[in-house]
Every structure is written in C-alpha cells, then in structure tokens.
C-alpha cells in the first residue's frame, strides 16, 4: 500500500509545523509521508528543538522550508497550524483535503508555552491518527 502524504504549514516553519512534523513522523510515519513548510522561512526555533528533545524527538536536523508546490499538490491532506497560514495557504487541487488546526505561536513567550503548544500538537496528531 502506498503511503499517503500530510503537509503541515505555519507562518515561518519555525515552531509549530516543525513540532508537528516531528510528532507526525513518530506517530504516522508507518502510513504517511510527513512534511512541513512555511509561508515564509524563519529558521527552526531553538526552543522548539529543545521542547521536542524533552520528549525524545530530535528535530535538530530539520530545516525551515518554504512551501514546495510539488509536495503541496501531491499531498492527501494539508494542515494549517495558524490563522496566517490558513488565510494565505495556496489554492489546493480538489483532490487535496485542507484542515485547520489552530495553535498559539509560542515564539518569544515563556518556556511553558513551548511545552503547552508541543503537547497540544501531539494530542491533535494522536486524534488524527485514530480517525484516519
């Protein structure tokens, strides 16, 4: 069976989508190709790397990438993780499902915000895994 593709999109591919890609590969990796990107690139936030390391997931090798049109149109589902990405997501082909899972941006906030958003993203991906 061919793997499906899920593409996590946020504004800068710095925090939320990076954490989603990390959890996605862990939780969905047997059945899904998992990618992330941003409307812009802001570099991977060191606190996102630290937050994921705290739960045993290494995203230190990830890069902050712009949306890749080839991945976008080959995706089965595109998940926007913030209102900016939701509003500015490119038009998708009819065969690509789009979902919006809004999460607060932890950048520039207390460490506990990174942990909270990380845990919310994990829970959302676990819920998604049970429904697909």
Curated annotation (Swiss-Prot):
The active site is at residues 10, 82, 89. It is found in: Cytoplasm. Keywords: Arsenical resistance, Cytoplasm, Disulfide bond, Oxidoreductase, Redox-active center. It is an enzyme of class 1 (oxidoreductase). InterPro entries: Arsenate_reductase_ArsC, Ptyr_pPase, Ptyr_pPase_sf. CDD domains: LMWP_ArsC (cd16345). Signal peptide: none annotated. Pfam families: LMWPc (PF01451). Disulfide bonds join 10-82, 82-89. GO terms for biological process: response to arsenic-containing substance. Belongs to the low molecular weight phosphotyrosine protein phosphatase family. Thioredoxin-coupled ArsC subfamily. This is Arsenate reductase 1. The lineage of its organism: Bacteria, Bacillati, Bacillota, Bacilli, Bacillales.
């Amino acid at each position: 069976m061919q793997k499906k593709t899920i593409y996590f999109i946020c504004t800068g591919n710095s925090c939320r989508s990076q954490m989603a890609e990390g959890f996605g590969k862990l939780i969905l990796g047997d059945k899904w190709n998992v990618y992330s990107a941003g409307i812009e690139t802001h570099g991977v936030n060191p606190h996102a790397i630290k937050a994921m390391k705290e739960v045993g997931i290494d995203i230190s090798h990830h890069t902050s990438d712009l949306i890749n049109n080839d991945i976008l149109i080959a995706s089965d589902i595109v998940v926007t993780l913030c209102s900016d990405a939701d509003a500015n997501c490119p038009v998708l082909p009819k065969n690509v499902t789009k979902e919006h899972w809004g999460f607060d941006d932890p950048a520039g906030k207390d460490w506990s915000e990174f942990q909270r958003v990380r845990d919310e993203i994990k829970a959302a991906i676990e819920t998604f895994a049970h429904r697909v």
